[in-house]
């Protein structure tokens, strides 16, 4: 772990906690995409299924458990506790196509040098999670575009997610430069995710510059 990955982790965790605070404080999940949260929960479940079989450090274990716990709790709040505030009329993205596409792609591109059935299974899940994470924000961005105005905490949530991804891009550049690291899947997926955030960041920066509420074009 280096400073870039640590800061990325903190921004990632911060984004999740801000979203949790928004839902709990407002007692409402208005403006939050259940579809995106389902995708992120699948990402963490698939990526950290090795939780009890692959110990790296106390920090890594803690972060894995925290990501899984917070994502499932957020899902519970949206789908159960505050479901009467959920905007299902606008959150209609067909996520099954995203899941299926990432699953097929992971079966084609996973590291074939992995030895053993269980290790291969985990490798496929890890590859799948990388692909899925890169596009998991799509339903959320589309929901916000359909509704127009974006609440401050919701926009901060997305900005922190983008910041997390930016620091991880720096982390990968650092590892390539000093450790001859080769992670094509992570790099390509990270670039795709950054591109998806770019349009939102433009309107976010513009709203901050002029001190106005963030409004996305419909």
From Swiss-Prot:
Cytoplasmic side: 24-57, 116-123, 174-184
Function according to Swiss-Prot or TrEMBL: Required for the retention of luminal endoplasmic reticulum proteins. Determines the specificity of the luminal ER protein retention system. Also required for normal vesicular traffic through the Golgi.
Single GO molecular function: ER retention sequence binding
UniProt-listed GO biological process terms: protein retention in ER lumen; protein transport; vesicle-mediated transport
Keyword annotations: Endoplasmic reticulum, ER-Golgi transport, Membrane, Protein transport, Receptor, Transmembrane, Transmembrane helix, Transport
One Gene Ontology term, aspect cellular component: endoplasmic reticulum membrane
All ranges on the Lumenal side of the membrane: 1-2, 79-94, 145-152, 206-218
Name of this protein: ER lumen protein-retaining receptor
Transmembrane segments: 3-23, 58-78, 95-115, 124-144, 153-173, 185-205
Primary localisation category: endoplasmic reticulum
């Amino acid at each position: 772990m280096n400073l870039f990955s640590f800061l990325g982790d903190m921004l990632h965790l911060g984004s999740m906690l801000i979203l949790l605070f928004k839902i709990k404080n407002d007692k409402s999940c208005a403006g939050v995409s259940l579809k995106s949260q389902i995708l992120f929960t699948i990402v963490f479940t698939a990526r950290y299924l090795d939780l009890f079989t692959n110990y790296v450090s106390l920090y890594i274990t803690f972060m894995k458990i925290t990501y899984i716990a917070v994502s499932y709790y957020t899902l519970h709040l949206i789908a159960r506790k505050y479901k009467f505030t959920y905007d299902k009329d606008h959150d209609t993205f067909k996520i099954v196509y995203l899941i299926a596409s990432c699953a097929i792609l992971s079966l084609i591109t996973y590291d074939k040098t992995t030895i053993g059935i269980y290790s291969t299974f985990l490798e496929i899940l890890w590859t799948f999670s990388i692909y899925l994470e890169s596009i998991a924000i799509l339903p959320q961005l589309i929901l916000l575009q359909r509704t127009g105005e974006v609440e401050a905490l919701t926009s901060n949530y997305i900005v922190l997610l983008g910041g997390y991804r930016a620091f991880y891009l720096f982390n990968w550049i650092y590892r390539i430069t000093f450790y001859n690291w080769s992670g094509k899947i992570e790099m390509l997926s990270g670039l795709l995710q950054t591109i998806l955030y770019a349009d939102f960041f433009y309107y976010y920066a513009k709203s901050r510059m002029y001190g106005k509420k963030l409004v996305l074009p419909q």
